[in-house]
Amino acid sequence: MSETAVVEQPNDEVSTEKINASSVGDTIKSTELTADQKDKLEKLIGAVPEILKKTDNPKYDEIFGYCINVDTNEHVDVSIRNEILLKFLVADEYDVETAKTRLVNTLNWRNKFQPLSAAYEEEFDQELDQLGVITGNPDGNSNMKYVTWNLYGKLKNPKKVFQQYGGEGESKVGAKEGTQFLRWRIGIMEKSLSFADFTDPSNNKIAQVHDYNNVSMLRMDPNVKASTKQIISIFGANYPELLSVKFFINVPVFMGWVFSFLKKMGIISAETLKKFQVLSNGNLSEWFGKDNLPAEYNGGKSTKFSSLEALAEATPEHDIPVYAKIILAQTKDQVIEDTNLSVD
C-alpha cells in the first residue's frame, strides 16, 4: 500500500459549511484587488468544500504547509489561506473554474508525492547537500529576501543521485515517488516557502538562482535534462505565483536558445519568462548588493561572507508552519499503520 497522508476532520465527511467571504478584500494584504477580482476570489474560496470533495483524498487539505479548508476549521488561518488561493487564481488569469481544477490537481499531487516529507523528513545522498542552499536577508529587497541557490556545477555522480529514491530494495510500504534528485529539489522549494509570509507584500515570494558554472552544456547528463523538464512541469503546475525573479547565471551565450524553446513549447508562460534574468557571469550585486554576497557572486569584492555556505549559515532560524508539523506526524502514523497491515 502506498503512503498517503490522512488529515483528521471533525466528521468523516468534508465540511460543506459556507465560507464567509464577505470581507475577503480585507484579508488580502499582498496586493490591491479590483471589485471583480475580489468577487472571483470569493467564488473560489466558497468552492473549497467542492474542491476537496473532488480530490482523491478529501481529507488532505494542505498546501505549502497551511490548511486549505473552511473558516471554522481549527487549523485554518483565513488570511494565509486566501492569499494562497489568490496565487492559484492569478496564475489562471482569474478564471475560477480553471483555478479550481488546478487546486484539485495540486492537492492530489501533494497527497501522493508528499513534498513536506521530502523537505523535512527524508535523507538524501550527501552530494545533493552540495547542490543547493537557502539564503536569507530579512532586510533585503522586496520579495528577494529569501533565495534558493542551485549549483549544478557541483554534480559529480549523476548516476547515483538520479536513482529512484530509497533504491531498488526499498519496501513498497511507504515508498516515495521520484528520484533522489527530484525529491531533494522539491524539498528545497518547500523549505524556502516556509520563510515566506504570504500576507506580506514584500515577502510573499522568493527568488531563485541557477548557477551553471563548470557545467558542460554540450555534455549534460541526459538524466539532468529529463529531471529539469520534470521539475519545470511540477513547479509550473503546483507552485504558482511564488517566484519574484529567477536568475540563470554563468550561462554560455549560445544557451539563449533554451529560453526561446521553453516559450515556444508553452512549457513556461510568457508572464513567468518575464521574471527570468539570464547572465553570462555570476555578478548579482545589482539585485542583492555587493555586501550581501560572497566574492564569487558580487564581482570579486571582499565581504564578510567567505562563501555561499557562510551566507546560508547567517540566515535567521525559523520554524515551519504548525499545520505542516501536523501533516508530517499524521503521515508517519499512516506509514506505521500500513507497515503493520503488510506484516499481518
UniProtKB/Swiss-Prot annotation:
InterPro entries, alphabetized: CRAL-TRIO_dom, CRAL-TRIO_dom_sf, CRAL/TRIO_N_dom_sf, Sfh5
Domain CRAL-TRIO: 139-305
Membrane topology, record value: Peripheral membrane protein
Major localization class: cytoplasm
Gene Ontology cellular component annotations, sorted alphabetically: cortical endoplasmic reticulum; cytosol; endoplasmic reticulum membrane; plasma membrane
Name of a matching Pfam family: CRAL_TRIO
UniProt-annotated location(s): Cytoplasm; Endoplasmic reticulum membrane; Microsome membrane
SMART domains named in the record: SEC14
Gene Ontology process terms (BP): Golgi to plasma membrane protein transport; phosphatidylinositol metabolic process; regulation of establishment of cell polarity; regulation of exocytosis
Official protein name in the record: Phosphatidylinositol transfer protein SFH5
